[in-house]
Structures are given as structure tokens and as C-alpha cells.
Amino acid sequence: FLTHDHHDHTAGAVELAQRSGAPIYGPKLEMGADTSGGTFKVDYLLEEGLLYPFEGAPIFEIYKLPGHSSDSLGILLSEEQLMFVGDVVFRHGPTVVFHPDGNLADYLASLDLLEDLVNLGKVNVFCPGHGHPIVDPLRSIRATRNHRIERLDQVKQALAAGVSRDADSLFDAVYEGVDEHLRWASLRSIEAQLVYLDSEQSEGL
């Protein structure tokens, strides 16, 4: 099962399928565009709202969770109240909104959807694509949302103070203390924030 089309999730899919004989399920028919091995076709397309029963295994239900990427999705094991959330939420800290494919408005809406699923009692545990399971999902959702809004406010303040409207300048002004090796990923999120602010301004006119 592939939750989204990023190389750290798709790179070994074909080899694993060949060795195990297992089919590949994914959110797009063709995946792996950013891997050195090139693209590959999935065996089955994961579509929102569909139930995927397997003999002797739990039933999976699919939810679209765009934002980190446009194709991100969650895989819910209803009976276990457990959801694989890909890179949408982590226990150890925030994820990246990968502009231009990722979108901050979509990401915040996906957090709202996850919060609703938890409040409805459909999910008790998140299993992210990196790190440990999240056994207190509401806390992680709210911490993640608060972080994104705080960063957005910091970008607004930096722009108001005269910082140049480009991602590199804003990184230097806002992301003080963030390790330099995270610059590239942070720049993607900053660009997504700028798009969000432009949209917010347009809607306010």
C-alpha cells in the first residue's frame, strides 16, 4: 500500500512486489516519477470511500488527505480503529507541505478531517510513514495545526517588517535555529505559505 508518490515511499515498491508476489496499491495508476528506477504502474488504484476486503485480513477504507502532497491518502482499518496516515502527521514533529504539489489550505482541511474521524470514534491510533505510532492523535493534530498557523503568522510578520518575499529570505528570517540540511524542505513549506497568503488576500478583496 502506497499512501503517496514520494520516492522515500515508492522506491522499493516494485522490488518488494516482485520478491513477495504482493500487488501494489496506490493513489495514482502511475507512480515513482521521482525515483531513479523510473515510473511504474500500480496493480490497483486506491479510491476514496471504497472498502477493500481481503481474505483473513481487516477491511481497509480510504480517505483522501491532500496537503503534504496532492495525492496523499489515509488507509483506515475500521475494526481496529487504526489509520495509516502516510506523511500527514508525525509524532516527532511537523511534516512538510511540498509546494507546488502540496497545498497548505488542503493540508489544514485534511487535519480537520482527521480530527473529525477521531472525535467520531472511528480512529484511536495513527500509524505515520515515519516514526512511531501516534496513540494520542488529537494532541498530535492540534500541535501540528498550531505549528503551521504559528509559522504562517511568523511569515506574515516578517513580510510586514520588510523581509523580501522570497523563500530563502523568509527562511533566514523565520526559521532561525532550524538545521541547514532542512532548508530545502522548509523552502517548499514557505512557498506553500506564500500561495496560501496570496489566496487569503484575494478572497478578502
Predicted regions and their residues:
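Metallo-beta-lactamase
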Residues: I59-Q154
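Aromatic/hydrophobic pocket-lining residues that form the small-molecule binding cavity
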Residues: T10, Y107, L111, I190
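Residue-level signal for inorganic ion chemistry
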Residues: L16, H130, V155, L197
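C-terminal regulatory/interaction regions
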Residues: Q157-L205
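Active-site HxH/HxHxD metal-binding segment of metal-dependent hydrolases
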Residues: F1-P58
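Short, leucine-enriched amphipathic alpha-helices that occur as contiguous helical runs
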Residues: A22, R148, L152-K156, L187
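Short, solvent-exposed loop/turn segments at secondary-structure boundaries
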Residues: S36-F40, V96-H99, R139-S140, L182-W184
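Histidine-centered divalent metal-coordination motifs
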Residues: T3-H9, H68, H130, Q193
